[in-house]
Design a protein with these regions (language model features):
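Extracellular/periplasmic helix-loop-helix junction of adjacent transmembrane segments
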Residues: 38-67, 106, 300, 305-310
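Hydrophobic transmembrane-helix bundles of small-molecule transporters
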Residues: 165-279, 285, 310
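12-transmembrane solute porter fold
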Residues: 16-31, 35-37, 206, 233-238, ...
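Cytosolic juxtamembrane N-terminal segment immediately preceding the first transmembrane helix
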Residues: 1-30, 44
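Central cavity-lining transmembrane alpha-helices of secondary-active solute carriers
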Residues: 58-72, 122-126, 312-325
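Helix-loop-helix hairpins in multi-pass membrane proteins, especially solute transporters
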Residues: 73-206, 233, 394
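Helix-breaking motifs and short loop linkers at transmembrane-helix boundaries and internal kinks
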Residues: 45-47, 79, 100-106, 167-168, ...
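Interfacial helix-cap and linker-helix signal at transmembrane-aqueous boundaries
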Residues: 42-43, 74-75, 159-167, 222, ...
Length: 407
């Protein structure tokens, strides 16, 4: 066995641990992500330009994506509980910064810490599930983990809009701090676990730096390219730099093998590779819901609460279908739900793109498309996540989970 557990007595995952894990995941997906729906409210009370505020909103996802694989490797090396605890601590500090922020400095720093928090929490908690749950118990635990991530992302617009409308947007992060503290309490007493073989390898600093450079340059190209001009020298420089850094990252990974930040041998498992690729594509598809929320506020003058209510259909269906997806997985295997989910999601994207429709009709179409999103993603989520976890080697479960969640 290549996973070391640090405990005097055998430990089996229980509901207390599972609730703590789900609450940990919610600190990012429910609270940190809710800023997407309250940008206008934050703009009115902060001394920050809209461009800077938009950058701040994307920073948490950017830093989470940059560091989630490295954090998964550190969880394998130093301990999954240790990284989960670190992530919750970063979430508390980052949320506190946002509560007191008046200008760009603290606000940007808080969003960065929230991203780093998510990078620590997501792979470490999936690794804890792989370590402490087996068989159907693992599939059930994965379902609830998925409810925390996919369900939290569906609820964040409504919760964020409701809190911002009723109490003010800063209270979103007060509640986030309270949830993080409760998660820390529930996770107390969980034995540590880590990979014996991972401790023999040093962190691949070169791979980490090249990955960060590639992701940052791609983000700048996508977010700033329109303003700079897609064919301007600056935009083309960003794109060329991203391609060069990506090439260096891949060559470094191929050369270092198991010692690389991402061991490309993981993708030899077709089931794991399919789960990672499809998860990447569907996570990108969720962006259409976020764009629709902003368009409903700025184009059709809905309030944050009203635009948040448009996602209730998604929330109900995704939460219902996540457990259905678990049952489909147990009865038919992962292939059927993992194929049906993207088809439903594609139909939802086509509907939500019909911005040329008259206001009342478009609002109805958006609500219906969100329902389809929930059906598709809920059907897909548990089979996909369980496939990634089940097919990851014990000594690389943190890294493998990080790669999966980087999407």
């Amino acid at each position: 066995m290549s996973t070391v557990t640090i405990s005097d007595t055998p430990f089996v995952g229980n509901d207390r641990l599972l609730v703590g894990i789900v609450l940990s995941v919610l600190t990012f997906w429910l609270f940190a992500q809710s800023v997407i729906n309250v940008v206008p409210a934050m703009k009115s009370s902060l001394d920050i330009s809209l461009e800077t505020l938009t950058l701040a909103v994307s920073l948490s996802a950017l830093f989470s994506g940059c560091f989630v694989v490295a954090s998964g490797g550190l969880a394998d090396k130093f301990g999954r509980m240790r990284m989960t605890t670190l992530g919750l601590g970063l979430s508390i500090v980052g949320s506190a910064m946002l509560v007191v922020a008046q200008g760009p400095g603290l606000f940007l720093a808080g969003r960065v810490l929230q991203g780093l928090s998510a990078a620590c929490i997501m792979p470490a908690t999936l690794a804890l599930i792989k370590t402490w749950y087996e068989g159907r118990a693992r599939q059930r635990a994965v379902s609830f983990w998925v409810i925390g991530s996919w369900g939290g992302s569906g609820l964040c617009s409504f919760v964020g809009g409701a809190i911002a409308t009723g109490l003010g947007w800063r209270w979103i992060f007060v509640f986030s701090i309270a949830v993080a503290l409760l998660a820390l309490f529930l996770l107390r007493g969980t034995p540590e676990s880590r990979s014996a073989s991972a401790s023999q390898h040093k962190l691949d600093v070169g791979g980490l730096l090249s990955l960060i450079v590639a992701l940052v340059l791609v983000n700048l190209f996508i977010s700033k390219g329109h303003g700079w001009g897609w064919s301007s020298p600056l935009s083309l420089t960003m794109l060329a730099g991203a391609l060069a850094a990506g090439t260096i990252f891949i060559r470094n990974g191929m050369r270092k093998g198991e010692a690389a930040l991402i061991d490309f041998a993981l993708f030899r498992n077709r089931a794991y590779g399919a789960a990672v690729l499809s998860n990447f594509l569907l996570n990108g598809a969720i962006g259409t819901m976020m764009i629709a929320s902003i368009w409903l506020q700025q184009g059709h003058h809905l309030t944050p609460l009203e635009s948040g209510m448009m996602t209730l259909g998604y929330l109900v269906t995704v939460l219902a279908m996540i457990r259905v997806g678990e049952k489909l997985l147990q009865r038919y295997g992962a292939r059927l739900p993992m194929m049906a989910g993207p088809v439903l999601t594609a139909i939802a994207i086509a509907l939500i793109s019909c911005t040329f429709l008259e206001k009342a009709l478009y609002i109805g179409v958006v609500f219906a498309s969100n329902v389809l999103f929930g059906l598709g993603l809920g059907c897909y989520a548990t089979p996909s996540t369980d496939t990634a976890v089940a097919n990851a080697p014990e000594n690389k479960i943190g890294v493998a989970s990080g790669i999966y969640k980087m999407g």
